[in-house]
Amino acid sequence: MIYLDNAATTLIKPETVYSAVLNAMKCAANAGRGGYSEASAAMNMIYDTRCRAAELFGIDNPERIVFTQNATHSLNTAIKGVLKYGSHAVITSMEHNSVLRPVFSLARKKMITYSVAPADRYGCVAAESIVNELKPSTALIVVTHASNVCGTVNDIYDIRRKTDDIPLLIDASQSAGLVKIDMKRLKKTLLAFPGHKGLYGPQGTGGLYIPEDMEVSTLTEGGTGSVSESPMQPQFLPDRFESGTLNTPGIAGLGMGIKYVSENFDEISEHEKKLTAILIEGIKKLSGARLLGYDSTEGRVGVVSAVFFDRDCVELANALGESFGVAVRGGLHCSPLAHKTLGTTLSGALRFSAGAFNTEDEAEKAVYYLKKIAE
């Protein structure tokens, strides 16, 4: 199989990730629930992973990072924890349903209102587009760092500079581990990230960074192993947002995934640029194909999507898989607003997304097979 659906999840992980997961399943007890060695080892491992994530994202205090089930969980925690009755939110036209649906749910209940800042035809959201949607009641701005449909990267630093001190939530689902993120440059900004994509951790892992200058309500409450005598949820992080048993094996694997990315960041970036260039140039040569987003590797991550004249993108994806063993994704990619922006609501798109463990030969073969079935 040629696996080119890394934007959904990285299927192939570093061997250290598999080993860490297995070791934790065999040896790790419940962190914070006992003073014996296995529980202490689990607690130390979780803290080590927290520290690795903090270092990768330029975060001074690792305890401001809370572990979640995935980026969707992180985004819901942030959105529903920041927005109050009467609040106004600004999202962009490139957001995933993990943002749109919780915001829409709150609006449907008449709790909040929201506006959508439009992106340009390349899927890029300018800071000015967001500024134009701000109101006195705006309590949160939500921006995807990189599009899961066309790969376009938004300038989160310029957006932060031009939106004053309004709380900002960055969805790093497609950028974490692929684009350098420095939270020291982003005041009053939350960061939601998955563990199973560009960080090469297992599925069922994610995180949310909550800065000290922001107040976020809890989505869930429960046992934390701390302040057990009180019916009140602990107010200190990370315990405030980590109720119940954590995914200890998953977090162990995530720690090794982050270690791998941190130690090989530049090499991974250059490798994925080469693969992305092969996919872009190959698709541009196909008759009847329209590439989405920028037509070079600049200003984008390794998500390469296209539409084809008179061809159904889901059928093309299925044909690539069934006939040639090429795993890609066709359709709307859980991002209807993005497809509306790009003019692909009816057709959807065929998406290729390379990862660190793909080869140039695989990318070239994928383009060759696409040509055979699309032309």
Placement of each model-derived feature along the sequence:
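Pyridoxal 5′-phosphate
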Residues: 1-375
